[in-house]
Regions:
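Serine-dependent protease modules
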Residues: 2-254, 259-262, 267-271, 297-301, ...
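Flexible, small-residue-rich helix->loop connector segments that border functional cores
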Residues: 29, 283-286, 315
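Conserved PDZ fold ligand-binding element
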Residues: 71-75, 275-296
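Secondary-structure boundary/capping motif
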Residues: 290, 316-317
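Exposed beta-strand face motif in extracellular beta-rich ectodomains
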Residues: 311-313
Length: 317
C-alpha cells in the first residue's frame, strides 16, 4: 500500500468535504475523520530512586492508517521501554489489545497494530503536508485529558511551520507545524486535519502552560515508514555511518568557527560504513542529502527516511 495524498486503503474515507449550506467545515471534517481517530491507554512499570517498582498508566490518541489495523501515534504515548500493555479504544467504544511494531524517540512516532478481524476500521485519507501554508485551517481530533472526553474536535489555523522545540529531556524536535487548535494532554498521537478532512499531521506537544500554541509532526515524515511497515511488517532504517554534531552547536562550543551556518559536522566516519565507502571524511560538513537540505542531525535522519537499504543517494558536503 503506497501512501499518497489520495487514500490508498480500500476503506479509506475519501468523502469530499463540502461545507455549503448550514454545514461548517468542522462539522464536515468531524463526520469524515472522527471514526479514524482512536483512544489509547497503556499500563507500564516505573522505578523510583530506590529501585521500587510501581505500576503506571497512560493515555493518548492514535490515527487508523490502514483498515488492516495499523495505527499511527506518538512514541511517548506507547514507548515500549516503559509500557507493558497497550489498549486501543475505537470511536464506538470497542477495546482491542495492540502490539507496538515500531517506535522512534527522536521522531516521537510509533506504529501499533490491532487485529482487524470483525472490525469495520476506517482509515484516514492522507493529505500532503508539503502543501500546507500558514493561515490554512487546522482541525485537531483526539482525546484531551482522557477517554471520558474521547473524540474531541478543536479548530484553528496553521500558525507556523518548521518550528523547533526543546523537550523536557533536553532533546529537540524540528520541522513541526505550529497550530492554535487546542492540543492538551491525551491529544498526543491524534490527528491534525486540513479543511478537506485529510490527515496533515500527528499532534505531539503544547508549549508549557501556553494556550494556543501546539505542535504537530508533518504527516509526510511518516509516509515512508508506514509504507514499509504495511508492506513488510517492519521498518529498516538506513544508516549512513557517521557521528556528527550540529554545526550550530559546534559554532557555539568549538574552538574554530565553521564556514557554514548549518549542517552536520562529521566527527567520525565508521569504518566500512556506506559513508566510508562513499569517501566521507572527518571534518566534512553534510549540507544536503538528495533534494533535502540538512541543517542538523535531526534533519539528516529525516532525509534518510526516504531511502531504502541499497538505494544510491547524492550527499553534498
Amino acid at each position: 500500500s503506497t501512501l499518497n495524498q489520495s487514500p490508498t486503503d480500500k476503506n479509506a474515507n475519501s468523502t469530499t468535504v463540502n461545507n455549503s449550506g448550514s454545514t461548517t467545515v468542522e462539522k464536515a471534517v468531524a463526520e469524515k475523520a472522527m471514526s479514524s481517530v482512536v483512544g489509547i491507554t497503556t499500563v507500564g512499570v516505573s522505578e523510583d530512586m530506590f529501585s521500587n517498582q510501581k505500576q503506571t498508566s497512560g493515555l493518548g490518541s492514535g490515527v487508523i492508517v490502514s483498515s488492516e489495523g495499523y495505527i499511527l501515534t506518538n512514541n511517548h504515548v506507547v514507548d515500549p521501554s516503559k509500557t507493558t500493555s497497550v489498549t486501543v479504544i475505537l470511536s464506538d467504544g470497542t477495546k482491542k489489545e495492540a502490539k507496538v511494531l515500531w517506535s522512534d524517540k527522536t521522531l516521537d512516532l510509533a506504529v501499533i497494530k490491532i487485529d482487524p478481524k470483525g472490525l469495520d476500521l476506517k482509515a484516514v485519507e492522507f493529505g500532503d503536508s508539503s502543501q500546507v501554508s500558514i493561515g490554512d485551517k487546522a482541525i485537531a481530533i483526539g482525546n484531551p485529558l482522557g477517554i471520558n472526553l474521547k473524540s474531541t474536535l478543536t479548530s484553528g489555523y496553521i500558525s507556523g511551520k518548521d518550528r523547533v522545540i526543546t523537550l523536557q529531556d533536553g532533546s529537540t524536535m524540528e520541522g513541526l507545524f505550529q497550530t492554535d487548535a487546542a492540543i492538551n494532554p491525551g491529544n498526543s498521537g491524534g490527528g491534525l486535519f486540513n479543511d478537506q478532512g485529510q490527515l496533515i499531521g500527528i499532534n505531539t506537544a503544547k508549549a508549557g502552560n501556553s494556550d494556543g500554541i501546539g505542535f504537530s509532526i508533518p504527516i509526510n515524515l511518516a509516509k515512508p515508514i508506514l509504507e514499509q511497515i504495511i508492506q513488510n511488517g517492519k521498518f529498516e532504517s538506513v544508516v549512513l555511518g557517521v557521528q556528527g554534531i550540529d554545526v550550530t552547536k559546534y559554532n557555539v562550543l568549538g574552538q574554530e568557527k565553521l564556514p557554514v551556518d548549518s549542517g552536520v559536522y562529521v566527527h567520525e566516519v565508521l569504518s566500512g560504513s556506506p559513508a566510508d565507502k562513499a569517501g566521507l571524511k572527518s571534518k566534512d560538513i553534510i549540507t544536503k542529502v538528495g533534494d533535502s537540505k540538512v541543517t542538523s542531525n535531526s534533519t539528516l535522519k529525516t532525509a534518510l527516511l526516504n531511502y531504502k537499504i541499497g538505494d544510491k543517494v547524492k550527499i553534498e558536503v
